[in-house]
């Protein structure tokens, strides 16, 4: 099988040296992502496209899906690459490939040609289109808005029969821009803002301020791992968790109620800036949108920015909530966000929307900054790829099994799309489907007299969810790894 990768248009208008650098980085990213599917896979770069060739036909759908999620790719063409002799040979091969698709449909033929030939692209379009029209009685040529467009590419003595076109996410390849640190809470905004910076070519590390205990951290780990695994797995990134409960306790005890929200955000920016400086990261990323909550007015945002020299990027600053939720739905983080607890909003009963710098600084004089220094020093930093192993250590009380008993039921916790693409069937045991993002609200509705064996393809999400369910008091869960 063969895929032709078309570059994001903004890459093609760069200078020759920059364009070449971007293409090299994108080629490396594609190799890093796809090596898990087929070790014999070949990735070859050209000036205006990248070729991906693989031998393992069983991985076709997985490879195609992975390519559509790599930043820097505009679209993917799945092609059949065959030699040809003349225009009639092109027609005959096109007839075999497209006959079934054109039955009872209107169509047109579009050809792109590279190399020296004794015919033009239009000549091929007319010849092949006329031949298809004659040999498929129920098909009819229609040059504008046809039901089917037959795409062909001719390159020297090779014919590319385009079997499908699949849109990518666009943007710049990860690694073409500098690293950023995303302040992730697991909600709608931080997930979308992280995705937007990945799409713009940044390697996104994650910094999480834990205000709600182990269950909250597990939930945010899931979001960060999902974003990395889906859009940024070509690069290693850090997940830094800071226990912010001591800081919140100090604020609740010593700070005036109206100033709490702004001061909490200032403390977070201070802490994140120290983490960024420690790891050589150039900027922070937040999901703040202008006017969305009390701390996100222009006055308050300016005061929050003032505590650090580190650049703070806010890709959602002009977005409304509906737009953000729609983006979260598109990238797959909506269901995570809906079940994620929100802690920052309850810290102050009557927050100020127009904080005064002198008042904020006066309140902060009451704060013991050694507490902030200590929580940053004790921050837990892990390679995001190690989240699975770390979870395995944390879920020591959850048994991992490769078989099953008469009272067991396998619980397939993959997303709905994954379940539909590759349904799980295991002989001798019932399989129930419940996506991971619904476990927090729907697991209690299941038969609690059964033992539920959580399963996902790689075992990461099943371990994370097993820990979460154990913390919620469900002891009838195990991890299924056949």
UniProtKB/Swiss-Prot annotation:
Physiological role: Catalyzes the ATP-dependent transfer of a sulfur to tRNA to produce 4-thiouridine in position 8 of tRNAs, which functions as a near-UV photosensor. Also catalyzes the transfer of sulfur to the sulfur carrier protein ThiS, forming ThiS-thiocarboxylate. This is a step in the synthesis of thiazole, in the thiamine biosynthesis pathway. The sulfur is donated as persulfide by IscS.
Pfam short name (any one): THUMP
Residue span(s) of domain Rhodanese: 404-482
Top-level EC class as recorded in UniProt: transferase
Residues annotated as catalytic: 456 (cysteine persulfide intermediate)
Localization per record: Cytoplasm
Principal subcellular localisation of the protein: cytoplasm
E.C. number: 2.8.1.4
Full protein name: tRNA sulfurtransferase
Species in which this protein is naturally found: Escherichia fergusonii (strain ATCC 35469 / DSM 13698 / CCUG 18766 / IAM 14443 / JCM 21226 / LMG 7866 / NBRC 102419 / NCTC 12128 / CDC 0568-73)
Keyword annotations of the record: ATP-binding, Cytoplasm, Disulfide bond, Nucleotide-binding, Redox-active center, RNA-binding, Thiamine biosynthesis, Transferase, tRNA-binding
Gene name tied to this protein: thiI
Residue stretches making up the THUMP domain: 61-165
Family recorded in the similarity comment: Belongs to the ThiI family.
HAMAP family (alphabetical): ThiI
Reaction equation(s) it catalyzes: [ThiI sulfur-carrier protein]-S-sulfanyl-L-cysteine + a uridine in tRNA + 2 reduced [2Fe-2S]-[ferredoxin] + ATP + H(+) = [ThiI sulfur-carrier protein]-L-cysteine + a 4-thiouridine in tRNA + 2 oxidized [2Fe-2S]-[ferredoxin] + AMP + diphosphate; [ThiS sulfur-carrier protein]-C-terminal Gly-Gly-AMP + S-sulfanyl-L-cysteinyl-[cysteine desulfurase] + AH2 = [ThiS sulfur-carrier protein]-C-terminal-Gly-aminoethanethioate + L-cysteinyl-[cysteine desulfurase] + A + AMP + 2 H(+)
GO (cellular component) term, any one: cytosol
InterPro entries, per the entry: Rhodanese-like_dom (IPR001763), Rhodanese-like_dom_sf (IPR036873), Rossmann-like_a/b/a_fold (IPR014729), ThiI_AANH (IPR020536), ThiI_fer (IPR054173), ThiI_N (IPR049961), THII_Thiazole_biosynth_dom (IPR026340), THUMP_dom (IPR004114)
């Amino acid at each position: 099988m063969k895929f032709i990768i078309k570059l994001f248009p903004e890459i093609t208008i760069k200078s020759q040296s920059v364009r070449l650098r971007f293409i090299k980085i994108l080629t490396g990213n594609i190799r890093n992502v796809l090596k898990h599917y087929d070790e014999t896979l070949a990735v070859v770069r050209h000036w205006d496209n990248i070729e991906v060739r693989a031998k393992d036909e069983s991985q076709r759908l997985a490879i195609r899906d992975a390519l559509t999620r790599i930043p820097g790719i505009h679209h993917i063409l799945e092609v059949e690459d065959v030699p040809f002799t003349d225009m009639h040979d092109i027609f005959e091969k096109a007839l075999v490939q497209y006959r079934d698709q054109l039955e009872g449909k209107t169509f047109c033929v579009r050809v792109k040609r590279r190399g020296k030939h004794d015919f033009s692209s239009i000549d091929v379009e007319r010849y092949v289109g006329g031949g298809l029209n004659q040999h498929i009685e129920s098909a009819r040529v229609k040059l504008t808005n046809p039901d089917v467009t037959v795409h062909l590419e001719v390159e020297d003595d090779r014919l590319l029969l385009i079997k499908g076109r699949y849109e990518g996410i666009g943007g710049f390849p990860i690694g073409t821009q500098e690293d950023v640190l995303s302040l992730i809470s697991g909600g709608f905004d931080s997930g979308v803002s992280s995705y937007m910076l990945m799409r713009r070519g940044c390697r996104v590390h994650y910094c999480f301020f834990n205000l709600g205990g182990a269950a909250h951290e597990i939930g945010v780990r899931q979001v960060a791992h999902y974003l990395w695994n889906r859009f940024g797995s070509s690069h290693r990134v850090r997940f830094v968790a800071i226990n912010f409960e001591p800081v919140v306790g100090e604020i609740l005890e010593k700070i005036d109620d109206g100033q709490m929200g702004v001061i909490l955000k200032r403390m977070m920016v201070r802490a994140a800036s120290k983490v960024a400086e420690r790891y050589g990261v150039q900027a922070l990323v937040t999901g703040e949108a202008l006017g969305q909550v009390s701390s996100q007015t222009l006055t308050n945002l300016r005061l929050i920015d003032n505590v650090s020299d580190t650049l703070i990027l806010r890709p959602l600053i002009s977005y409304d909530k509906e737009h953000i939720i729609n983006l979260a739905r598109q990238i797959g983080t909506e269901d995570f966000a809906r079940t994620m607890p929100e802690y920052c909003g309850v810290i102050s009963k009557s927050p100020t929307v127009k904080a005064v710098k002198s008042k904020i600084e006066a309140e902060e004089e009451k704060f013991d900054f050694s507490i902030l220094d200590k929580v940053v020093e004790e921050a837990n930093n892990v390679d995001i790829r190690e989240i699975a192993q770390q979870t395995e250590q944390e879920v020591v009380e959850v048994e991992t099994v490769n078989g099953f008993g008469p009272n067991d039921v396998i619980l397939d916790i993959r997303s709905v799309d994954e379940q539909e693409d590759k349904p799980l069937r295991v002989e001798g045991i019932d399989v129930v489907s419940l996506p991971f993002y619904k476990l927090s609200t729907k697991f209690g509705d299941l038969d609690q007299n059964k033992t539920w064996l959580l399963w996902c393809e790689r075992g990461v999400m099943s371990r994370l969810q097993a820990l979460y369910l154990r913390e919620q008091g469900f002891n009838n869960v195990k991890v299924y790894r056949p």
